[in-house]
Amino acid sequence: MPDKEKVCTGGDLAEVLSRTRLSAEEAIAWKSDLEAAHKDSSATMTANEMVEYWSSIGSEMVHADDKPYLRADKFQTQLYPVPWAGPILSADVFLLFLNPGYVSHEDEYEKQPKLARLLRDNLKGDQPYFYLQEEFRNHPGYDWAHRTFGDGIKEYLSRICVLQLVAYHSTDGGEARKVAASLPSSKKTIKFVQDSVLARARLGKVGLVIARSSSLWGLDRVHEEKNIIIYRGGECRRAYQTPASRGGELIRQILARN
């Protein structure tokens, strides 16, 4: 039976394959792409470079680099991408998740001009975490965020950033796991986390909660420290950040002291 921690982080290849239905050939390619993504030794990726990279998307819903890798029948490419939610340029706390989910009536909400503008402005990197803003109260993302974070967070939306390994919405997280290692935009995000966020967390400058898929983020061998929490086992199934959770406790400690 796969190790509980590995099942959570994605570290057990057999478990990941059973969930995503990869063929043997796809499994080999998946592993190769994942290793390549984590061994990229090019220049450090900064938050400003992340914003610049995503600014090139213009009015499109899919980054040009990603188009060869995404299937429209697996991802909701009619929705705005969410590589991050919150001020990636200045956040005091970063939370790592897999990819944004999807419910059928989400499309109608995102056609509303005000919400569409908020979603597009999010890519500027200086906007508050939007899913808990009043404009999103009727959006399905609001319900998810409220259940995930619980109370006592709304006053800190300008200091929290949720990073998604895969920026595109899907109903099945298994599809995101399949493409994460090969998707160019995901490689950028992985590099940003490893180069910038992790280093700053170790220096005590930001908090880091690895809530989902630590192996796919290339962080499964990172040790927990004062400002770094890695969810394991049952923690990462729903990845709560409520006051009673380990991540939620760290988040509130950091936000309260700054």
Predicted segments, located by residue:
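A Trp-anchored, charged/polar loop motif used as the substrate-binding/catalytic surface
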Residues: 69-84, 140-149, 183-198
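Glycine/proline-rich loop-helix segments at beta-alpha junctions forming the active-site rim
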Residues: 2-34, 38, 42, 158, ...
